[in-house]
Amino acid sequence: MAPKKKVAGLIKLQIVAGQANPAPPVGPALGQHGVNIMEFCKAYNAATENQRGNVIPVEITVYEDRSFTFTLKTPPAAKLLLKAAGVAKGSAEPHKTKVAKVTWDQVREIAETKKTDLNANDVDAAAKIIAGTARSMGITVE
């Protein structure tokens, strides 16, 4: 077995799927760790090709020899809720002004998608987490 590579850094970014380019925020974040920026952009765009339009968080592990690996996460719950509710942004005063409504079925569907990234044991617990996010955005869950 080959010796383990030493980790030099961990970078977390949220990039629109299929649209990673060397411009900020991607370029500076990777450049300071000495990563080949174009190599990452091509790999990320290829990996997220089928999810175009969604914001996909990525966790990039940079090693001392300047090589890297990355893990794709599920889209942020807030973005999925906005898409389900059909609104551009959440409420400025979430507990006073409600901007939209989503059904429990939509919340459960989002919870199914997010379950791997959430700290929940089952779909019901994940749905409660998503409902809490909706509430804090001014979206009513029915």
UniProtKB/Swiss-Prot annotation:
CDD domains hit by this protein: Ribosomal_L11 (cd00349)
Entry annotated with the keyword RNA-binding: yes
Organism superkingdom: Bacteria
Any one of the GO CC terms: peptidoglycan-based cell wall
Maturation and modification: One or more lysine residues are methylated.
Keyword tags: Isopeptide bond, Methylation, Ribonucleoprotein, Ribosomal protein, RNA-binding, rRNA-binding, Ubl conjugation
Gene Ontology molecular function: large ribosomal subunit rRNA binding; structural constituent of ribosome
GO biological process, alphabetically ordered: translation
Covalent cross-link Isoglutamyl lysine isopeptide (Lys-Gln) (interchain with Q-Cter in protein Pup), where: 101
Pfam families referenced in this protein's UniProt entry, alphabetically: Ribosomal_L11, Ribosomal_L11_N
Function: Forms part of the ribosomal stalk which helps the ribosome interact with GTP-bound translation factors.
Quaternary data: Part of the ribosomal stalk of the 50S ribosomal subunit. Interacts with L10 and the large rRNA to form the base of the stalk. L10 forms an elongated spine to which L12 dimers bind in a sequential fashion forming a multimeric L10(L12)X complex.
Family: Belongs to the universal ribosomal protein uL11 family.
HAMAP family per the UniProt record, alphabetical: Ribosomal_uL11
Protein name: Large ribosomal subunit protein uL11
Species per Swiss-Prot/TrEMBL record: Mycobacterium tuberculosis (strain ATCC 25618 / H37Rv)
Gene behind the chain: rplK
